[in-house]
């Protein structure tokens, strides 16, 4: 609390029980949570320190290596702790008893803290696992399946999401009268390889099943690989449903039906609740459950029409005429629907847009003029894509309007035509957004490639810093600080020498590590938002890098390349110095023997 009183803004730290980067690229489960957290800290004028653990180069199988405020063999130290924050968001599972003990000790001391995901005692934001598993099982039952296998997470996570989803599966099997057989349960540890091995175990168990529910999408992906290898056709021989609805699930073959978790919303809610704690409001330990939604694709056995209905949110339509809806009623319904899909817009923004859209829609219907509605929709689509959200999320708002169109006093054909045109506008916005992303990706890849080439050939630190200063600024990264640890007594990370990589002329700062970020580098009067990535030197734990918490998808590769370049420069410097000393020794030897 003392830090908040010394500054204008509260500082929120974020830690996870595993790494954010899979070697150099983001892990898709944490990414939307982090984006939700960042959006909320911007909305509520809070400082942010994101702990982004890094994978070990060349070891894509090592995924439990988080950025953590304590130095351990299975984590990398970053300065995000009770000494420089006002509260922490901790994302479960923690994967280590020592990490659980650490955060529970903070709770016992009264430090503000909230969890995302189940597994620890304390205030928690969780997905409604029971609702999600139940919807998956009922959907498979509707397809005629009576024997449904289950790929669970980790046996060590029975107090967390693994246990909650497994218990929900068992309860659903009993309630729906499905085949009960312990051989139908296997553990996949929520990773692709584990899912593949779990499916092999299920196939070899001798138990009969025609469908599978996986506890997450990575396990489902591995299960699909094993089924393909065994010659099983999906969904004709075995139907499969995942959990999480990660972006890559939509491009699998066949596309994966999955339970969608509103991860962005969970991150956003975590900030809201943590700020309540920081300001002195006590929170009970009762978890806040966020609703899930089954996203229908091909892997469950649904045909094209059902998938299209789900994509366009057309499945639920009223069957009886009621009183004409008001703008307030439409706003409420649209807000609830869009909120489930949004990944970059806050609730109050969504409500404002929905109110404007509902008002414009009713105005266009009443005046027989489509322009007010079309203009408002185009404006909303532009603002949505500018915030980095998906234009497609407004399809669900159009579905709400369509479901209510038959209650309007005007001829029904008129609002229907208006909404058909709205679908076309959204489609055009999606196409434009996709093209923009393709262009941006090519431009960024070109700059990252050039930077990589320069770092690979750099033999001294001056070349490294010059290359980074030029290309990071061009890529829109305006904050990039390199901190190298220095020891004091028995503390190897007590001090840091911090260099501003984007502004190399700025003097190197010598600062207490646990007081990061240095106050003298926070002078613009606005909240800071920083992502901290560990740097591992040849001895491990050399330091960390701090970036703007904006381009998280780029930062892992940049940090890894910089770490490798600095190590290369160090080795070159040591080799050059060794050669110089050897030459001096040879000269002395020659002079000695020439006498």
Positions of PLM-derived features:
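Bacterial carbohydrate/catabolite-sensing allosteric modules
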Residues: 1-348, 352-368
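GAF sensory domains
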Residues: 380-388, 397, 473-560
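Heme-based O2/NO sensor domains and their adjacent alpha-helical segments
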Residues: 345-409, 497-502, 521-524
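Amphipathic alpha-helical "output/dimerization" segments
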Residues: 395-400, 414-424, 467-469, 546-570
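Catalytic cores of nucleotide-enabled group-transfer and carboxylate-activating enzymes in metabolic
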Residues: 253, 257, 455-456, 477, ...
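Primarily the dimerization/phosphotransfer
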Residues: 577-595
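Signal-transmission linkers at sensory-effector interfaces
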Residues: 308-336, 373-376, 411-461, 571, ...
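Helix-loop-beta substructure at the N-terminus of cytosolic sensory domains
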Residues: 347-355, 363, 367, 391, ...
């Amino acid at each position: 609390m003392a830090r908040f009183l010394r500054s204008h803004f509260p500082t929120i730290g974020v830690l996870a029980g595993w790494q954010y980067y899979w070697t150099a690229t983001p892990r898709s489960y944490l990414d939307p949570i982090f984006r939700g957290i960042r959006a909320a800290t911007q909305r509520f004028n809070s400082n942010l320190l994101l702990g982004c653990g890094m994978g070990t180069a060349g070891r894509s199988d090592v995924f439990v290596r988080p950025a953590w405020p304590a130095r351990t063999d299975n984590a990398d130290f970053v300065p995000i702790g009770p000494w420089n924050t006002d509260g922490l968001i901790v994302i479960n599972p923690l994967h280590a008893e020592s990490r659980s003990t650490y955060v529970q000790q903070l709770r016992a001391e009264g430090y503000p803290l909230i969890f995302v995901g189940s597994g620890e005692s304390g205030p928690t934001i969780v997905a409604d696992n029971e609702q999600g598993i139940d919807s998956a099982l009922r959907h498979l039952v509707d397809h005629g399946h009576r024997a449904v296998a289950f790929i669970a997470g980790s046996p060590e996570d029975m107090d967390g999401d693994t246990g909650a989803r497994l218990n929900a599966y068992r309860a659903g099997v009993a309630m729906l009268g499905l085949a009960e057989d312990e051989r139908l349960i296997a553990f996949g540890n929520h990773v692709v390889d584990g899912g593949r091995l779990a499916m092999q175990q299920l196939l070899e168990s001798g138990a009969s099943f025609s469908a599978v529910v996986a506890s997450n999408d990575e396990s489902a992906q591995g299960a699909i690989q094993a089924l393909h290898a065994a010659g099983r056709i999906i969904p004709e021989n075995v139907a499969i449903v995942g959990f999480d609805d990660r972006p890559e699930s939509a491009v699998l073959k066949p596309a994966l039906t999955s339970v969608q978790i509103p991860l962005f919303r969970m991150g956003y809610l975590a900030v809201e609740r943590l700020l309540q704690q920081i300001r002195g409001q006590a929170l009970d330990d009762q978890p806040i459950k966020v609703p899930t939604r089954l996203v229908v694709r091909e892997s469950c056995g649904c045909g094209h029409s059902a998938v299209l209905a789900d994509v366009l949110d057309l499945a639920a339509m009223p069957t009886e005429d009621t009183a004409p809806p008001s703008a307030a009623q439409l706003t409420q319904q649209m807000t609830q629907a869009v909120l489930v899909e949004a990944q970059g817009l806050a609730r109050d923004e969504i409500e404002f847009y929905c109110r404007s859209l509902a008002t414009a829609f009713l105005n266009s219907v009443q005046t027989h003029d489509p322009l007010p509605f079309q203009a408002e929709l185009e404006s909303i689509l532009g603002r949505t894509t500018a915030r980095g959200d998906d234009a497609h999320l407004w399809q669900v708002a159009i579905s709400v309007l369509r479901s209510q169109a038959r209650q309007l006093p005007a001829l029904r054909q008129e609002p229907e035509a208006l909404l058909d045109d709205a679908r076309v506008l959204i489609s055009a916005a999606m196409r434009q957004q996709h093209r923009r992303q393709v262009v941006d990706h090519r431009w960024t890849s070109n700059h990252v490639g050039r930077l990589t080439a320069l770092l690979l050939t750099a033999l001294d630190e001056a070349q490294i810093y010059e290359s980074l200063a030029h290309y990071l600024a061009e890529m829109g990264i305006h904050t990039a600080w390199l901190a190298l640890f220095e020891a004091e007594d028995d503390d190897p990370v007590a001090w840091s020498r911090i260099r501003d990589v984007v502004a190399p002329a700025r003097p190197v700062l010598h600062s207490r590590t646990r007081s990061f970020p240095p106050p003298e580098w926070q002078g613009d009067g606005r909240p800071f938002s920083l992502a901290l990535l560990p740097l591992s030197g040849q001895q491990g734990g050399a330091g960390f890098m701090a970036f703007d918490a904006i381009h998280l998808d780029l930062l892992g590769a940049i940090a890894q390349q910089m770490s490798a370049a600095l190590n290369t420069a160090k080795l070159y410097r040591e080799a050059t110095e060794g050669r110089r000393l050897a030459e001096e020794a040879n000269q002395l030897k020659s002079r000695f023997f020439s006498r």
